[in-house]
């Protein structure tokens, strides 16, 4: 975007960009702008197309201000900031509404990545049930890798798990938690991934509300669960 070869970044522009676009699906990719040399300054449309194709996760905000300020003036810088890196949106979901302790809970979630890239570091994923009355919380770690939630793609998470046999009767809200996998950061909500949907983020916990509520009931509404995936009390 700064010159024919982006100041020597590329030799074969078409092939090199194709290669970097694939690498950027798995590795950190980004950079900075430069004073245009022999080409017209990149406008918003061109800039966003290039960053998405190259899977950018970061942009130097200090250089080159002549180009960065142009994007601000054209009104796309906020959108660039939102879509830089990954941007996960919950598009739909379904779940078992009434479940008996010790029985099967089914949840299906669909998440779209509207960002330029995917996460390049490992990330934990948990399904959380929290009692509406006393806030008692149950957690289920999921065998899901958000690094595989690629840009412009929708991913499906299918969960079949059991409730503890001693789980108290009552209503429970369902949350999705994507904490940092490091033990020292796992319970720090500042390091949890926030979904882009409005009205779902819980800042004090780092949980994302799925806007779903199940009723744990003594009535046998679902099949008995005999598998290994069982929620545990936090």
Q: Where do the model's predicted regions map?
A:
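Catalytic cores of secreted or luminal carbohydrate-active enzymes
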Residues: 43-98
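Extracellular/luminal regions of secreted and cell-surface proteins that mediate adhesion/ECM remodeling
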Residues: 78-234
């Amino acid at each position: 975007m700064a010159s024919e070869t982006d100041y020597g970044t590329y030799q074969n522009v078409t092939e090199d960009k194709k290669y970097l676009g694939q690498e950027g699906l798995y590795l950190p990719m980004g950079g900075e702008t430069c004073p245009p040399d022999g080409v017209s300054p990149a406008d918003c449309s061109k800039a966003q197309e290039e960053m998405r194709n190259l899977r950018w996760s970061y942009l130097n905000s200090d250089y080159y201000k002549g180009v960065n300020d142009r994007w601000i003036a054209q009104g796309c810088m906020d959108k660039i900031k939102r879509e830089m890196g990954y941007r996960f949106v919950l598009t739909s979901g379904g779940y078992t509404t009434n479940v008996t302790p010790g029985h099967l809970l089914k949840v299906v979630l669909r998440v779209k990545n509207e960002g330029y890239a995917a996460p390049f570091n490992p990330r934990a994923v948990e399904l959380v049930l929290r009692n509406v009355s006393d806030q008692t919380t149950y957690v289920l770690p999921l065998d899901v890798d958000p690094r595989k939630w690629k840009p412009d793609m929708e991913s499906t998470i299918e969960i079949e798990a059991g409730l503890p046999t001693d789980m108290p009767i009552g209503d429970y809200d369902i949350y999705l938690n994507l904490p940092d996998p490091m033990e020292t950061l796992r319970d720090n909500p500042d390091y949890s991934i926030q979904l882009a949907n409005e009205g779902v983020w819980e800042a004090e916990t780092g949980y994302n509300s799925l806007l779903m509520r199940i009723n744990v009931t003594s009535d046998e509404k679902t099949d008995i669960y005999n598998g290994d995936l069982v929620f545990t009390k936090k």
